[in-house]
């Protein structure tokens, strides 16, 4: 039913059905309205497991060795409905794991293997993911057997790792702990294109102009087009795409070559047929197809006749074993462009020895030409990549080690710090990309530290702003950032414009001294100072409260910090502190919404935090926009009271600023930004603002503010879970 009137024998029998399609949704009627849906994802209404289910505890009960044994057996248990190439599913499973993890992009931390999102649209139906639905169906008996003790997210990531082990690679390790989502993600921007393989994401001729935060060159691809830029072979141009996209997945040149080569050491591409015979993707398939897509109902369409990418062939002589054959073929042969049976561009070797050809996937008496994609040829022809490839070719052990580490990074990049890894195969080594933080001291006199903070000459605004700036970098997407580690005192964070370096230096000097005197970490004292400021402000508003505090944060060092990797965490805007670094094409309220989602806040938590921070005097550079109170420093609900007061009128001024005037006299009372006024203009946010403006909700406002504040301060305290 889609809500349409049904008055014929073939129409919907319900006169006013529920709206089950998007044709007449609110966003269709009002496409420019602020869409708060990204803040209301993945709650108990979509999760069938119930609010008391804790996957991170459940997975600890898993028989890890039995699971791995079953996965090893799966690799060579070929099923007639989807036969394994050469009797081994390793290549398919690796592609599935790679394409789950490879959707990660460092700019906003979204994508990646951490949620099992490959089960849902749009990823389950991307052109680059053709036939990965078959890989997940092959895993279903194992998922069914181990049930709640293994998430789809963990199983999808683990399958590729076990596949490599089964083909002879010594892997670096594996950490469990990825929790499944149960609904397509609404917050991830995959691009603006309205058609598959669209490439309207460049604002210039340079391949570096790829739109942020995207890390793929076309809609529906994981990284680059394997045939070449926009489907036109040109290895040196493709090398530019490879460098940009892998860089945006947090990989350097050596890791890029290792991952490309290691991913193509095993398995094959599939294009031995006509793609026009493929049925619709899983989301568009008929109900009888039961969630499977790209079904060929015209020709055989399986085994040697499978069509996926359209390119046809294996990269190496022995596609079911880990070896150095990729570099042997790539570097020792000349290659020429040809078309696959499906019509895709691919590179094939000139005058190849018969014994260097891989055998047919079904008949070992037949040998086939190996192939290379344009991305593979980029490794050969780009001088930087070529040098790395030659080193790997000469030193297979080094290649295997670099690849194993890069594969581990790829499949764990969005899991956050090592403390979140579960299981017997977690590597002991701390890796700098994990943003390590040492354990902090829990056994110090918290009351004494609070007393010293309260006795300092720091203002409420200084204390609260510093704590907020330290914690606001947290991203729930890849679990990076946050207050733990106190990296706000290190490069690059101490110099970020959004952190007001001059003010920050003054505050840190005082707080570091208090930390030294009390035995607390600086990270703890920064958060504690924010709490002290809030307690003071609440008291000024007539409420005695204690802001919850959990000691034990550690202090990271420069040696533990890859400064360059933190550049992507720099706030370029902060609606909570009413600040924009510069004017952007995106509306300020939308930027705030994106930051809110990354921090893991709900719409009403966002509302109460903005209203509270305004009256505490925390605006960047002490601007007065949105400070709708004459009691700055008191935790009152004045922001909401005055925002909703019809004695006021709101008049545009300049540069997205507004004047709030007395409706009778016309006198200017306050100034505001779009971020301030959206809490009165958006119908949903206004409903929250009205709750907090009520005369009987002054205490509720304070309690809700403290709860939301504490949530942010502890967002990265995975040790408390």
From Swiss-Prot:
Binds 1 heme b (iron(II)-protoporphyrin IX) group per dimer. Bifunctional enzyme with both catalase and broad-spectrum peroxidase activity. CDD domains: catalase_peroxidase_1. This is Catalase-peroxidase 1. Its cofactor is heme b. It is an enzyme of class 1 (oxidoreductase). Keywords: Heme, Hydrogen peroxide, Iron, Metal-binding, Oxidoreductase, Peroxidase. Coiled coil: none annotated. Its EC number is 1.11.1.21. Formation of the three residue Trp-Tyr-Met cross-link is important for the catalase, but not the peroxidase activity of the enzyme. The gene is katG1. One of its GO terms (biological process) is hydrogen peroxide catabolic process. Belongs to the peroxidase family. Peroxidase/catalase subfamily. There is a cross-link at residues 98-223 (Tryptophyl-tyrosyl-methioninium (Trp-Tyr) (with M-249)).
């Amino acid at each position: 039913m889609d809500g349409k009137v049904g008055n014929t024998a073939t129409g919907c029998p319900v006169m006013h059905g529920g709206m089950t399609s998007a044709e007449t949704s609110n966003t269709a009627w009002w496409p420019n309205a602020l869409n708060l849906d990204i803040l209301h994802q993945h709650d108990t209404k979509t999760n069938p497991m119930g609010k008391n289910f804790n996957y991170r505890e459940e997975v600890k009960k898993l028989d890890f060795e039995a699971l791995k044994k079953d996965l090893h057996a799966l690799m060579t248990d070929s099923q007639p409905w989807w036969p394994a190439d050469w009797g081994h599913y390793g290549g398919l499973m690796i592609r599935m794991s790679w394409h789950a993890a490879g959707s990660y992009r460092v700019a906003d931390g979204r994508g990646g293997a951490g949620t099992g999102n490959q089960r849902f649209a749009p990823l389950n139906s991307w052109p680059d993911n053709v036939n990965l639905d078959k890989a997940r169906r092959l895993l279903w008996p194992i998922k069914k057997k181990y049930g709640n003790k293994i998430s789809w997210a963990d199983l999808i990531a683990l399958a590729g790792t076990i596949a490599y082990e089964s083909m002879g690679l010594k892997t670096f390790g594996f950490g469990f702990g990825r929790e499944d989502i149960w609904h397509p993600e609404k917050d991830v921007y995959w691009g603006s294109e309205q058609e598959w393989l669209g490439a309207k994401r460049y604002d210039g001729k340079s391949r570096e102009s790829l739109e942020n935060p995207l890390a793929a060159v076309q809609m529906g691809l994981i990284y680059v087009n394997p045939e070449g830029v926009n489907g036109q072979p040109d290895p040196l141009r493709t090398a530019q795409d490879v460098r940009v996209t892998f860089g945006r997945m947090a990989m350097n040149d050596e890791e890029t070559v290792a991952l490309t080569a290691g991913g193509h050491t095993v398995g094959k591409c599939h294009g031995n047929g006509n793609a026009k015979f493929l049925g619709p993707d899983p989301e568009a398939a008929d109900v009888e197809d039961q969630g499977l897509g790209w079904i060929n109902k015209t020709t055989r369409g399986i085994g040697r006749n499978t069509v996926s990418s359209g390119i046809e062939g294996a990269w190496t002589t022995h596609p079911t074993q880990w070896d150095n054959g990729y570099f042997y073929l790539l570097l020792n042969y000349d290659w020429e462009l040809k078309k696959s049976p499906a019509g895709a561009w691919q590179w094939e070797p000139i005058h190849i020895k018969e014994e260097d050809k891989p055998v047919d996937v079904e008949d070992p008496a037949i040998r086939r030409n190996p192939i290379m994609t344009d991305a593979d040829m980029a490794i050969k022809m780009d001088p930087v990549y070529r040098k790395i490839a030659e080193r790997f070719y000469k030193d297979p052990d080094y290649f295997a080690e670099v690849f194993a580490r890069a594969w581990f990074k790829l499949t764990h990049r969005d899991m956050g710090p090592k403390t979140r890894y579960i299981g017997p195969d977690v590597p002991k080594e701390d890796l700098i990309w994990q943003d390590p933080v040492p354990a902090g001291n829990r056994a110090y006199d918290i009351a004494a530290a609070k007393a010293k903070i309260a006795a300092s000459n720091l203002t409420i605004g200084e204390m609260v702003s510093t704590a907020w700036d330290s914690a606001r970098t947290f991203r729930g997407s890849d679990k990076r950032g946050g207050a733990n580690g106190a990296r706000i005192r290190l490069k690059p964070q101490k110099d970020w414009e959004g952190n007001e370096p001059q003010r920050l230096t003054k505050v840190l000097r005082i707080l570091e001294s208090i930390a030294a005197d009390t035995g607390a970490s600086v990270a703890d004292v920064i958060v504690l100072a924010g709490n002290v400021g809030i307690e003071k402000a609440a008291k000024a508003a007539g409420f005695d409260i204690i802001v919850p505090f959990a000691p034990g944060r550690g202090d990271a060092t420069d040696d533990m910090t890859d400064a360059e990797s933190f550049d992507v965490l720099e706030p370029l805007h902060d609606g909570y502190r009413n600040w924009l670094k510069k004017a952007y094409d995106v509306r300020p309220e939308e930027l705030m919404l994106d930051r809110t989602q990354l921090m893991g806040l709900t719409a009403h938590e966002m509302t109460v935090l903005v209203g509270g921070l305004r009256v505490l005097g925390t605006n960047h550079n002490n601007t007065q926009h949105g400070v709708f109170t004459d009691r700055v420093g008191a935790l009152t609900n004045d922001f909401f009271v005055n925002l909703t007061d019809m004695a006021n009128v709101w008049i545009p001024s300049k540069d997205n600023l507004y004047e709030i005037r007395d409706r009778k006299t016309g006198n200017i009372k306050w100034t505001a930004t779009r971020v301030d006024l959206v809490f009165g203009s958006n119908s949903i946010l206004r409903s929250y603002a009205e709750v907090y403006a009520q005369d009987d909700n002054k205490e509720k406002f304070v309690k809700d503010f403290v709860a939301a504040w504490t949530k942010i301060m502890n967002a990265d305290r995975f040790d408390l879970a």
